[in-house]
């Protein structure tokens, strides 16, 4: 491996933020970008009507509702490292998109609201991280408000999320009594100095817990802090890098992201300790980031990042080798060589053309309908990266057009929006219905809104007699043909061209499985791999 490739790979830190909605994920995303020098002015998310919206929530509907529904990617340099931050949807209906984003990162940051503690969505996301032993750092947010006792929160994280907590910073009071944090490793008190927006103002730093200046400024709270810390140090774990990298321990930081406080301490430790690019599993072997030849996989497709150009961008995670502009790469699924001269890098919606990209980087490829989620790109080797799932939807609706003459635009719009992977399109074999499947109700609203805004199609979604769907496959070609003839009324083609059994009831599905034992019914399907 060339020394430049080795150096650049070692500099990369690629991570995502996970949290329950409203724990402050978008705010902390903004502040990380602010401290990383990537944006001059953080647009606070609360002022949704204001002209400045949070940088990472760039799609129109997100701006209206104040929730992030698509993962965007932001890159910024910090202390000699290159940080790739993947923002994930904050709404539970978009769990599949979040799940796939978590396949493209090497570590994660968990944000917890000090008043609410561990919430349901956080538990689900942690389960996903645990499946891959993803290293996790934790930021307990909103210390400028009243909340629960920090020691109780650590206990809850340990009990509910089954991960050891190692506090790195410790809060001095909270709400009106919030005075700052004590950095355990550096033996320094960082005094709270709230600033908003783009101002970074560093409060006074007092070296040493026994410094008389502390008593002078904090009065009785200084003695309280010393007492509390004695208790904390005795009851909690001290930071162990090997345990953190194995996904068994989480370093914990406290702060108030909206007030730009406590974020820099987190970022400093993150670039120091978080893992660089890790090896990746394929169907045939494990790919090491140090390998010379380029490889990567697509974990997300986003339509219309630029409403002026009706474009679709495929987000590719570089896994090995160096990507350089104008390079010829091999798209494994369709066995086609393509030259890529206009790949993009991201600063939320601002796009710049890539000259070179290294393992850990995320690049955007222009997609004209030929790239799918899960696609592997290499320099010729027939590799398929694994672990990028497609889930069977839980809710189904039939598309209803207000103007029947717009059928062509509706089909095109649904096909393109479904390529993003948050919703799935099914075309029954025996009628002309267009059935949309989703994980949650919000997705139908999003699709209707985007059809109107981006394709000028006025459509609504009505109930349809479908309760569940399964991808079907069979090794016996004759039996499969017979099954397709006899069960045609329940079969549909999905937007990837695969055959799906759509069942009106769970009982119907059970009966079909009993009647056709040779046919396999799949609840999930690997992207990039036919069922």
UniProtKB/Swiss-Prot annotation:
Give residues annotated as binding GTP.
Answer: 19-26, 87-91, 141-144
| Keyword flag Protein biosynthesis | yes
What GO terms in the biological process aspect are recorded for it?
regulation of translational termination
**Highest taxon above the source species:** Bacteria
Coarsely, its chief localization is cytoplasm
MF (Gene Ontology): GTP binding; GTPase activity; guanosine tetraphosphate binding; translation release factor activity, codon nonspecific; translation release factor activity, codon specific
Instruction: One GO cellular component term, please give it.
Output: cytosol
Q: Which family does it belong to?
A: Belongs to the TRAFAC class translation factor GTPase superfamily. Classic translation factor GTPase family. PrfC subfamily.
What is the protein name stated in its UniProt record?
A: Peptide chain release factor 3
């Amino acid at each position: 491996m060339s020394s430049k490739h080795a150096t650049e790979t070692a500099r990369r830190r690629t991570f995502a933020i996970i949290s329950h909605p409203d724990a402050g994920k978008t705010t902390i995303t903004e502040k990380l970008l602010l401290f990383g020098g990537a944006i001059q002015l953080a647009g606070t998310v609360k002022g949704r009507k204001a002209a400045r919206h949070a940088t990472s929530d760039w799609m129109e509907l997100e701006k209206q509702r104040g929730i992030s529904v698509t993962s965007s990617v932001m890159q910024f340099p910090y202390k000699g490292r290159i940080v790739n931050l993947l923002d994930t949807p904050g709404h539970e209906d978009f769990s599949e998109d979040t799940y796939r984003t978590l396949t493209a990162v090497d570590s994660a940051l968990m944000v917890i609201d000090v008043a609410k503690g561990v919430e349901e969505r956080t538990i689900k996301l942690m389960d996903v991280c645990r499946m891959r032993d993803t290293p996790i750092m934790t930021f307990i947010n909103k210390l400028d408000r009243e909340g629960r006792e920090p020691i109780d929160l650590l206990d809850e994280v340990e009990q509910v999320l089954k991960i050891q907590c190692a506090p790195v910073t410790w809060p001095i009071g909270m709400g009106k009594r919030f005075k700052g944090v004590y950095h355990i490793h550096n033996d320094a008190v960082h005094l709270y100095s709230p600033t908003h927006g783009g101002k970074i103002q560093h409060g006074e730093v007092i070296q040493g817990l026994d410094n008389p200046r502390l008593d002078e400024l904090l009065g009785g709270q200084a003695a309280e802090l010393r007492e509390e810390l004695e208790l904390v140090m005795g009851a909690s774990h001290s930071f162990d890098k090997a345990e953190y990298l194995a996904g068994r321990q989480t370093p914990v930081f406290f702060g108030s992201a909206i007030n730009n406080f406590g974020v820099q301490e987190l970022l400093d430790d993150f670039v120091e300790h978080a893992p660089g690019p890790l090896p990746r599993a394929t169907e045939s072997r494990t790919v090491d980031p140090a390998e010379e030849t380029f490889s990567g996989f697509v974990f997300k497709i986003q339509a219309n990042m630029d409403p002026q150009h009706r474009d679709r961008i495929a987000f590719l995670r570089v896994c090995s080798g160096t990507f350089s502009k104008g390079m010829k790469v091999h798209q494994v699924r369709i066995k086609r060589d393509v030259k890529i001269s206009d790949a993009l890098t991201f600063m939320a919606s601002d796009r710049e053309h890539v000259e070179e990209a290294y393992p850990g980087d995320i690049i955007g490829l222009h997609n004209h309908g030929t790239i799918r989620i899960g696609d592997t790109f290499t320099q010729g080797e027939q590799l398929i990266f694994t672990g990028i799932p497609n889930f069977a939807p839980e809710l189904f609706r039939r598309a209803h057009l207000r103007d029947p003459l717009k059928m062509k635009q509706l089909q095109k719009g649904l096909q393109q929006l479904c390529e993003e992977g948050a919703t799935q399109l099914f075309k029954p074999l025996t009628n002309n219905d267009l059935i949309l499947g989703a994980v949650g109700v919000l997705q139908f609203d999003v699709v209707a809104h985007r059809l109107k805004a981006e394709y000028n199609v006025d459509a609504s979604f009505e109930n349809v007699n479908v309760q569940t769907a399964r991808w079907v496959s069979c090794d016996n070609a004759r039996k499969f043909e017979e099954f397709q003839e006899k069960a045609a009324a329940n079969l549909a083609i999905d937007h990837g061209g695969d055959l799906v059994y759509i069942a009106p009831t769970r009982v119907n599905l059970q009966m079909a499985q009993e009647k056709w034992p040779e046919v396999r019914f799949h609840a999930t399907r690997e992207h990039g791999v036919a069922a």
